[in-house]
Structures are given as structure tokens and as C-alpha cells.
Design a protein with these regions (language model features):
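Core of compact, soluble alpha-helical bundle domains
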Residues: 2-145
Length: 145
């Protein structure tokens, strides 16, 4: 996917089936986003990712659900409720580096796994999640020793 703000229709092989449908639609996506934030909030291996979020994850969870709905080829809830996602601009206030990027992608894949998304679909979506998360990076990284 070239533009993270566009539908993610190239994340699967069948052009008639969207990733939104492949993961099971709204109810499955809702469960995935709930699992994602529960993992982030409770698992120490996501502590840096958790630290860039405020104390209440409810708003972020709701907005991620809205965004992913449209991004995965389902209803464009975020656009309907908020307007253009402007992902990078909306994330600039939050320090996002390689650690946060990697934790975000790992947490999302773990959430999809726990919610029963099949391996083939996870494997198709993971690179698109990575590309989008990488595009969010805005923090200077220390050079490798």
C-alpha cells in the first residue's frame, strides 16, 4: 500500500474480498482493537508504546477501530466522524521511534492472533501495518554503537 490513508485493498489476493471481510468485519475488528489496547496496557514488552498514550486508552481505541474499518476496506467510519485521517500530522505530538513502531506492529499481530485471524491474513496485513507504522516515526534515533 502506497498511501496509508487509502483503503488497504492490496493486502490480500482476491480483489473481491477486502481485508475487512477477511478478518471478520466490524465485530472482529472491534475485538482486535480491544485486544490490542488490553495487551498494550498490561504487557511489559509494550511499555514504550504504552508510554506515548495518555492514561485513558478509550478514545484511542475507538479512533483506531474507526480508522482501521476504512483502511481495511470496510465503512469509512473515521472519515465520517472526524474527517481526513491525516495520520502523520495527528501523530506528530507523540514521540514515535523504531521501538514504538516495532511494538505497535507486534502488538497488532498478537491481537489478531489472539482473536483468531488466520495466519495467511496476518501475514498479508503485517507488512502494511509495518509500512504505516514506519511512516509515523518522528523521533530521532540514537546511532547504533
Amino acid at each position: 500500500m502506497n498511501d496509508p490513508q487509502q483503503s488497504n485493498k492490496d493486502a490480500h489476493e482476491d480483489p473481491q474480498t477486502t481485508p475487512y471481510e477477511l478478518i471478520g468485519g466490524a465485530s472482529s475488528l472491534k475485538a482486535i482493537t480491544e485486544e490490542f489496547y488490553a495487551l498494550m496496557d498490561t504487557q511489559p514488552n509494550y511499555k514504550e508504546l504504552r508510554a506515548v498514550h495518555g492514561p485513558d486508552l478509550g478514545r484511542a481505541q475507538e479512533r483506531l477501530f474507526w480508522f482501521l474499518s476504512g483502511w481495511l476496506g470496510g465503512p469509512a467510519l473515521y472519515v465520517e466522524k472526524v474527517g481526513s485521517p491525516m495520520l502523520r500530522a495527528r501523530h506528530l505530538p507523540f514521540p514515535i521511534g523504531e521501538i514504538e513502531r516495532d511494538q505497535w506492529v507486534t502488538c497488532m499481530v498478537e491481537a489478531m492472533t489472539r482473536q483468531g485471524v488466520d495466519e495467511a491474513t496476518r501475514d498479508r496485513l503485517a507488512p502494511h501495518f509495518y509500512k504505516t507504522a514506519d511512516w509515523m516515526r518522528n523521533k530521532a534515533e540514537d546511532p547504533a554503537p
